[in-house]
């Protein structure tokens, strides 16, 4: 009964048990061996287990195989000689001749002829007897030689009373013979598995016909020098399966193999059948198949895909065989799976861009040496193999950042400067928008400086209180507007060459002047933009639930909607002096405050210094957005929305805008799509390089701020892309012990669960993190320290997880958005549901995760990190 438990155990456990019994408990070892012989051949499912056990018991070395072959030959010769002598003796005595002859014929394997009835002489018997004695002597000498070989190779204890030489050599011979049989069987299976599949191309069994759509078009033809107009039906090309048995068979094979190629785990459950139907629909739409062909392919696929073929069954048998499992276990050991799980570390990167040597940048020595850690830490089990790194705080990276992010826009060795806007274009085309915003905003009050200081966390709060005290004794002056820049320590997905970004803050004294006016009135100004557009436009002030509903409502306004993604390449760098003055005109129009106007004027000319390593960089730039300014986000939204509104007005189109600063999506009717072809040239007049993305015609394919709309229980919600799993598995925070790691996992998980309740895959991932953290409680301050600014915007203060079931409808919508079909979703969720993420700190740099990004349809170059 005890031995039967081993049938379900792992290969490693069984082998460890056999080794222990052989070395310590020989009686149990032989009982186990006898039990294996008893169950062998009784049940096919157990034969693989028996073979695996005997294979481990054998543990054959190369020298034994040669000895076993020679021993088998000698033993056959001895048995043949002994049976022949026995036959001759029987013939001499005339008793038992038939039995002796049969035995001899069997032992000689029919290879030696001996008459059945004859009377051998004494001399014949003596000759045969001498031959047998000689063979026995040679066999004995061989056994002595073999025993010495075993002592030399395996030591004295290997051949003993429990494991005699002859039994061992016979076992080796049997195992080798079985291995040869298995090799022949494997070759047969291999030939069957690797035989080419006869799948015809779609175009060979389909034909294209033109059919009338029911719509008419006006056609103008010239006849006898005069134009004649008449209506003609609009024709459309439709593909259909040929009406032959051969074509239908070919189509059946094609659709079955096509769907299995996309997902080989589909079976006959409700979700699988829905997935199969959607795959057929997608294929039909792609190749413009008629409804009859789609229906036929759906019927065929629903029957053929869920039923495994003999090849599928054999493939599964090979993959799950004891030998295959044993080899995978050995690879796991070599890869240190289980030993390298935990929080690993990756060092920072140096930008590959060369230094241009711009004369505008002055580098001086003598600064205090600064050492900043640029390591990034990631959870080895969940990072999906996506490589995130942070830039080193080096002189090279600093120079690249200043040259490529402040002065030039090119990627090569030549200095290419940003385009300049046309003279007075902002005033000429956007003056109406500026006045409309000022009118909508109305009165805005200036808030107390103490309130501004108290809105920051402890460290910054003390600095602001100090600045407030300073302003009471020393009035604001221009030097307060000077900028001290530093390299932004952020996660970069290393899919392309990257130039690090800069943060360019001014003094706390300066920020108090702007913050008391602008920070607390930002929402009011953003709502004014919504009022001018006539619908919610700046979506950064909404959580992902509300954003999804707003975008869906915008989409439903149009009969045939299309979404055009727009991204302003390095927006801050392209904000010109003219754009800044236009933006400042709005603030001055709202507040009418001379102190604010003076501070805003000091944003036009920027004196910047930067400390890195033991160097100080100085440079000066006119115009450009300083990313550390309090009005950075609001100003970018005002400029972008103003330009877009003026563009819509110029085109005379009805369109909806989704804006979050430099990231925009235009939603309009498909009939207006061509009108936006000149967008790049239009915005170039304003000094901006505007990059348009490929238009999308399905709501789930609309991407905004690295998220897409997914219908969760019938309500659209903005859901982050699957690669967010890899990003949330990395942190820039210092982790000193396992408690820190668990706090980090808990903070990420709690926020992730709020945003992704009821979302396929993502909910399971964040539940996995939360469970692995031990459901650790963390402070609100720690949560804000861990999560990114973008995540905090999506949350909008939410902290409560609402348990939401994952429905089939949600799974199908998630598939439409991200290309991960429902069955793959379930597989990934099972992986996370059974995973415990280790909080162990590891010193290794790179490990390969169990779950790779390819399973989640994450393209290698899908990144919004600009170079």
Swiss-Prot record:
GO BP annotations listed: viral RNA genome replication; viral translational frameshifting
Pfam families: Luteo_P1-P2 (PF08467), RdRP_3 (PF00998)
Keyword Hydrolase assigned: no
InterPro entries the record matches: DNA/RNA_pol_sf, Luteo_Rpol_P1-P2, Rev_trsase/Diguanyl_cyclase, RNA-dir_pol_PSvirus, RNA_pol_HCV
Catalytic activity: RNA(n) + a ribonucleoside 5'-triphosphate = RNA(n+1) + diphosphate
Spans traversing the lipid bilayer: none
Gene Ontology molecular function, alphabetical: nucleotide binding; RNA binding; RNA-directed RNA polymerase activity
Domain of life: Viruses
Record has Transferase as a keyword: yes
Record-listed E.C. numbers: 2.7.7.48
Function: Probable polymerase.
Name the record gives this protein: Putative RNA-directed RNA polymerase
Native source organism of the sequence: Barley yellow dwarf virus (isolate MAV)
